[in-house]
Regions:
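Electropositive phosphate-/nucleotide-binding environments in soluble metabolic enzymes
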Residues: 32
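Hydrophobic positions on the alpha1 helix immediately C-terminal to the Walker A/P-loop
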Residues: 63
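N-terminal intrinsically disordered, low-complexity tails
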Residues: 1, 5-28
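P-loop/Walker-type NTP enzyme "switch/lid" segment
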Residues: 21, 25-28, 36-58, 69, ...
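Conserved catalytic-core segment of NTP-binding enzymes
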Residues: 66, 121-203
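Surface-exposed, flexible loop/turn segments at secondary-structure boundaries
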Residues: 12, 57, 86, 116, ...
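Conserved NTP-handling cores and scaffolds of large molecular machines
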Residues: 8-15, 46, 71, 75, ...
Length: 203
């Protein structure tokens, strides 16, 4: 177990508590190398990983950025999918034009782009419409689903469960044990594979 990442043992909630999770750097401090062990474990082959915050909105984005930087530094092509944006976009339409926007670092892209938010759903996209994920798998070594807390928007839980594995991001001093347990059980109820927990310090 690295200082960043606690693997789940037999689905035990104990492995998800802040006391047993390991600490990640803040988004501002994240550097290539900080997530090296996590990357070796989860991305030894092309993978789609959901990174979702447990109860605290926004902390998962910094973790996604750190993991993406680690992968990009190793020469892997990475796409980050902001799930809150995807839930406001019709993936059936935008997937035909799989345009992605390069971000600051080489080898990192974002999909869908802000410009592709032209059709708002009355209902969130169903997991059965996962052709967009299959298309991304054809083009990228790593797919990072940047998921807000699973109870913050309809559809987040279902999209998190579509990934090969899910990481829960816990903020020290703010995420409660009860919230972690609730999120763990909700993800497992949808068949999600819980890979571990990352502890971040609050700002």
């Amino acid at each position: 177990m690295s200082r960043l990442f606690a693997a789940l043992g037999k689905g035990s909630v104990e492995a998800l508590t802040p006391q047993t999770a390991t600490e990640a750097p803040s988004a501002a401090d994240a550097r290539p190398g900080d997530y090296s062990e996590l990357v070796r474990r989860l991305f030894n082959r092309p993978s789609a990983i959901a990174v979702t915050a447990s109860g605290v909105h926004g902390v998962q984005t910094g973790v996604c950025e750190g993991i993406a930087a680690e992968l990009a530094a190793a020469g892997k092509q990475v796409v980050v999918v902001p799930v809150d944006r995807l839930l406001l976009t019709n993936p059936i339409r935008v997937i035909d034009d799989l345009s992605v926007l390069p971000v600051v670092s080489p080898n990192i892209w974002v999909w869908p782009s802000i410009a592709q938010q032209f059709e708002v759903f009355d209902q969130p996209p169903a997991p059965s419409g996962e052709n967009w994920l299959a298309r991304l798998r054809q083009s990228f070594h790593a797919i990072l689903l940047d998921c807000p807390p699973i109870d913050s928007m309809p559809g987040v839980l279902e999209l998190s469960a579509m990934a090969d594995a899910t990481l829960l991001v816990v903020e020290a001093g703010r995420t409660t044990r009860q919230q972690i347990r609730k999120d763990q059980l909700a993800l497992q109820s949808k068949g999600a594979t819980l890979a571990g927990c990352i502890l971040v310090q609050g700002r």
